[in-house]
Amino acid sequence: MRYDIAIVGSGPAGLSAAINAKIRNKNIIVFGTENLSNKLEKAPEINNYLGFYEISGEDLKNKFKDHIDSMGIEVNNNRITNIYAMGDYFALISGQNMFEATTVILATGVQYGKPIKGEEEYLGRGVGYCATCDAPLYKEKTVAIIGYNKEAEEEANFLNEIA
């Protein structure tokens, strides 16, 4: 079967794309994980998502799940490892399985390098990746930023105004 759209990623961007495609009566397949988004699930409080404030990541994730369930959108747990342009369609590979789609949307989120010891364990409990999202949690506290690029410097300057 060839899908109109294959969406790789089940976080906020991927699910938003899926909802919009479904509304437009596109034949879609969404690849992701059963829990939708590990990073979202671990967020202690979200205040920068329009329409939702002072909501935990887990509660927001549950709202996402309710929304896609109400529209009949399912998340396929196959992990896509390769995508090939085949002319007028794309072949998406997962193990021995191949899926075809006319359009592919990559919504895999931000990928981080090798984790620092304790990083995964404390994600959402002191460790964060988004100054805009997490800065209010660190108001008037001492924070440390680990980063190796211009973006990390900008995040540090932003946090300096709040923490």
Residue ranges of each PLM-predicted region?
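Residues in the short beta-alpha loop(s) of Rossmann-like NAD(P)-binding domains
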Residues: E34, A43, N149
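N-terminal Rossmann-like dinucleotide/flavin-binding domain of flavoprotein oxidoreductases
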Residues: E41-M98
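Rossmann-like dinucleotide/flavin-binding elements
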Residues: R2-Y3, I7-V30, Y112, L123, ...
